[in-house]
Amino acid sequence: GLLATSAAASRAQGLESLRVAIEDRIRASGAEAVGVYVRDLVRPDSLLVGAALRFHAASMMKVPVMIQVFRDADERRLRLGERIPVVNTFRSIVDGSPYGLSLADDSDSSLYARVGGRASVRELVDLMITVSSNLATNILIERVDAARVQRTALALGADSIQVRRGVEDGQAYRAGLNNTTTARDLGVLFAAIAEGRAASARSCREMVRILQRQRFNEGIPAGLPAGVRAAHKTGWITVTHHDGGIVSARDGRRYVLVVLTRGIPEEAASARLMADIARLVHGAVAAR
């Protein structure tokens, strides 16, 4: 009745002042574009600021790839313990011409020493997410197929994400065939993982654990209080810096936060923006 109505009204007011604070911080950043998606996983509250703006997905596309791998494991199309060849020759989606990845452009170099050998699917997923290995990503995409990753993302409600290809396909890049996403698309995928809908409940718990082992923590986690865990993924390419995932407060409250940015040349500045937005969001969500 009345109490519930007034609680809802004060929540709406809290969300509105959060929106204003986030918009002010974005303006101050001088960014060309910023997309923010917040979804409370306890209450039916969400906040969207530029959440429909389209960005180059960068390494955020590794999240739907992980989801597809776990769904395939659930359906016994592959085994996580299965050891598959570590290769560094891939085919361009434009004309099938071969290309390889350069160690210098990859945030993880460990896998290159193992080309010609084998690695387990589980290990490749771990490298793809925690250290954002491009090589692991392309090996897994060849295994699960980008078109299937795309269909799964759409089925989960990420209705405008485009997962077209692996990483560093120069021909595709020149042809404008890029992986793109909105903050909302990614937020919907993280919510599906958090709520155990992206794959089996067991697989979703495992995906959260992998995301919690993320090594790049200069963005969202830097804005969170000690003891608050983020299960998240980052993405960085030239002047495009992203971070997003599932935040678990100490009292068990959980929410999804995604921040996508374009046009901030300085990585330290975009990291500060993400951390500040995380601080604002956490203050508002945890206070309610």
Where are these regions (language model features)?
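C-terminal segment of classical bacterial N-terminal signal peptides
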Residues: 2-9
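Beta-lactamase-like hydrolase cores
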Residues: 11-53, 280-284
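Structured C-terminal helix/loop/strand segments within mature extracytoplasmic catalytic/sensor domains
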Residues: 14-25, 143-145, 188-218, 229, ...
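Solvent-exposed, acidic/flexible segments
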Residues: 15-19, 31, 54-63, 77, ...
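Extracytoplasmic
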Residues: 29-34, 42-44, 50-52, 56-60, ...
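Mid-domain, small-residue-enriched loop/turn segments at the edges of structured enzyme/sensor domains
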Residues: 33, 117-121, 125, 131-195
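Active-site SXXK
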Residues: 44, 56-89, 95, 128, ...
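Conserved catalytic neighborhood of penicillin-recognizing serine enzymes
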Residues: 91-138
